[in-house]
Amino acid sequence: ARPADRHYSLHAAHTSTWTFVPADNVWEAVQHWRRTNGIEAAGGVHKAAGRFVFDLWGGRYGESADALRRAFRYGLTDAMVMWHNWQRWGYDYRLPDIYPPNPQLGTLDEMRDLIAACEQAGVPIALHDNYIDFYPDAEGFSYEENIAFHRDGTPVKAWLNEGRGARSYRYRADRIEPYLKRNLHLIREGLAPTSYFIDVWSSAPPYDYWTADGRFVDRLFTRSVWGGLFAWIRDLLGGDAPQISESGHDQLIGWLDGAQTNHLRVGPPVGEGRYRWAVWNWPCADAERTPWFDAAHHDRFILHGAGYSSRYQGGLDARLHGMYSDDYMTTEVLTGHPGMVSQPFGRDVVRKYWLLQDLMRALALRTIEGVEYVDGDLHRQHVRWSGGARVWVNRGEADWQVAGATLPQYGFLARVPTEGGLVEASISRHNGVIVEMARSADRLYVNGRRVVDPALPIEPRVDAFKDRGDRTIELTLEWQADVPIPEGYRAFLHFCDQQGEILFQASQDPSALAPGRQGTIGATATATVPGEVAVGETLELRAGMYAPSGGQRLALRGPDDGTRRIRLGTIRLEGEGDRLAAITWKPHVPEPDPLLARQNPEARPVDFGPIETAGACRLTRQGDALVITPLPDERAPGFTATLRWDQLPWKLPRPARVESLSETGESLGRSRLEFDGDAVAVECSPRAFAHRLTGD
């Protein structure tokens, strides 16, 4: 595109058919194209549609099975699981030699139990596989027989596993089948997953290639091989096992059932980290995410979430733009994509399901009838769905008054008529507080967003700093641990550049933070600043704790950088020219946390009609009883839920008692209820799984 020359061109490979659809706007055009293109959904689409997604890249088999069972007890069963890291030699290494499962993550029986836990809950589980990257140390590797070549006779390089120093090469499409079928027969007999995930095939386009002896193979052949193998796996596993891939282009619709979205933003790289690149860096006056792909394919190709969290946030603060943020969830609602989470269990996991899942189930397999940019504003979008469903999304900075609601930035309102009644969900501003609500015929979820600190009460700080000369520094640290140091975690001290990338690390004695230690813990750390760091540069020290077994970081107290690292301060290399005079230290000065503007720090009770509370809980009917289930988190403060009995969506007899229940259904105690008119206050304890209100 050359706008200054008024020149725009489209390019396609090989023999192509172009279809032009004239219409008053693109949304009318895409409706016509959707109705007439003849594309049919693959066999597993009906099974994948609408399902919440556990997208799991780390963790051990046994512990993850236990965590998923907890999630299922909280009702998170209209779902599917993507299990990515399990391959025999580790993730993305020595492919295609992937079976049996990696013993470093647990036993074969534990892996089978993980799959059984999902099957018992009616939750499909997919295992991650890859037939793009062939590693030279894998059995059967041969440039001549298996690897694609460029026109000039050089092999096509594929993924570089930097952590293990291993370069892979791209498969010839005509040589994938024997390796894939060998693996799938082993996996079906040994593990029996109920879904399957193949990486890259719907993020990279089908490719042309040459063989080692100079034969040309076009991309249409590659596409037919990929598609045919997806269909073969679905038949082999049985039960219309959904086939899932990465990102989700439209070239495999009819064979492939869905993909994990990567819905990037348009704009220049900003923020920090290695995923600053994850944007469409196109200069333009304005831009916004919009449901273009789903307008064409929502009912025949199931996209999950809004993207892997690091790619979606693209260098921005994960708390404000990551997978559990209002920004991310509003994009899921805008597109009608099932919610996606990165953990098997947790407060945010349950919260996201309770807020979004009834809505996503109601939108599953519907079609988009139109998208309006209200008053010409790209950031205020109104999406009309088949069957009378309506969604309003505000991604602009100013509040938007619409359909009786006040939508803040990254707020939404959705109303979907169903046979069982109206399904409604929202993130809205209510009396100055941003809150969450979702209701359907069977459930009512509310969240007054009282602040619940996800951090462990462990906070690091620097007590003293010393420049020891010769580019060596010494830090005296104090770790205030109000709870015991957890098992399996180790401290880290990163010195980072302005993008948050690690340039070098300081070391401290790991025994100082041995598991079980508590109180004020002193430690000394040292570091040598590399010669590549020039005089005049400033670097930031960020500290935290991580699990060497899987890389997960703990959330700690202090000024978090959005990646679970606490900002402690900066060092600066002072001097003139290339001559270093000294290394100086400046403590970090915390700024107001922008996340608090989206929460309820004063814990003001919010009136949701049938219930008033600053807490977060779901109401369900159980016969003549009412069950209140708080969001899980034993470290969260208790809260009061004031029920207005006559305004509940169900006609229930007035209760006389409340019984607190454990996760396994055991009674934790009973107490009498006292009504004030039609209102009754219930004290919700974080130590209880649920509170059941009954008449006896």
Spell out what each predicted region is:
Residues 422-426, 499-516, 659-678:
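Solvent-exposed beta-strand/loop surfaces of large extracellular or lumenal domains
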Residues 1-20, 52-62, 151-154, 159, ...:
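Active-site-proximal substrate-binding groove within the catalytic cores of carbohydrate-active enzymes
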Residues 490-500, 643-647, 655-663:
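Extended low-complexity, serine/threonine- and proline-enriched intrinsically disordered segments
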Residues 669-696:
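Proteolytic cleavage junctions
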Residues 397, 480-486, 498, 633, ...:
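Short solvent-exposed strand-capping/beta-turn motif centered on an Asx-Ser/Thr pair
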Residues 537-545, 658, 689-696:
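Short, aromatic- and glycine-rich surface loops/edge beta-strands on solvent-exposed regions
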Residues 38-179, 189-195, 203-211:
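Aromatic-lined carbohydrate-binding/catalytic grooves of carbohydrate-active enzymes
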Residues 454-602:
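Extracellular/lumen-exposed scaffold segments
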